[in-house]
Amino acid sequence: MAHVCVAAWKAGELSFENAWRPSSEIGTPGRPENPILAPPREVQRRRVSGEKGRIALLHAIAHIEFNAINLAFDMVARFGAHTDIPLEKRSDFIEDWLNVGDDESRHFKMINERLAELGSHYGALTAHDGLWEAAIATKDDIAARLAIAPLVLEARGLDVTPGMINRLKRAGDGPSAEILETIYQEEIQHVAAGSRWFHHVCNARNREPATYFHELVQAHYAGNLKPPFNSVARDAANLLRDFYEPLAQ
């Protein structure tokens, strides 16, 4: 469905109305019956030393990608006509987040196919609902959504994914490592989109971006940001150190 929607947009078969006023309500998106959602401490650990551990790791990543699809399309539906996005930029905003959703859908498909090769599938293990809880917490503010979803949560993926790739390679799981390498490179562009649109919103609100980011993270995110940071990837995404280093533990 994500691919169909994006193709329709690019073909000029979809449009948006300038008077569009999406509801501030946010419910549970369409989901399969499984995975069963549980508190994070009850989710199977993600060690890569054995096949079961690698399946648990890939299942957790599949769940992240599944939720990231919904987050990207919710960004379009909820904020695509937001007044903090200049009118002449709204088509660009929508296209950016449709493309992100398309990428996340492809990432999910790659991971689920790899799970099938290992004799498993998405939904076979438990998962937690932290990403969608972040969507609910930021449903009323485009700046908060941009700060938390791409610039905190997705940026965290830039920090941890290279280590996952190396561990998978050491465990002899080259196919899984190759998939994560593809995802990692594309996630840099997703964080870059978040940074770009966050700066647009800051400009509309006459706010200094790093200071405003600190305020939003402290208001909408529990705890501090966790080093070590992948500053090379974050720099490539235009997420600079004055944003995240002051919030580190």
Task: Set out the residue ranges of the language-model regions.
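Non-heme di-metal
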Residues: M1-Q249
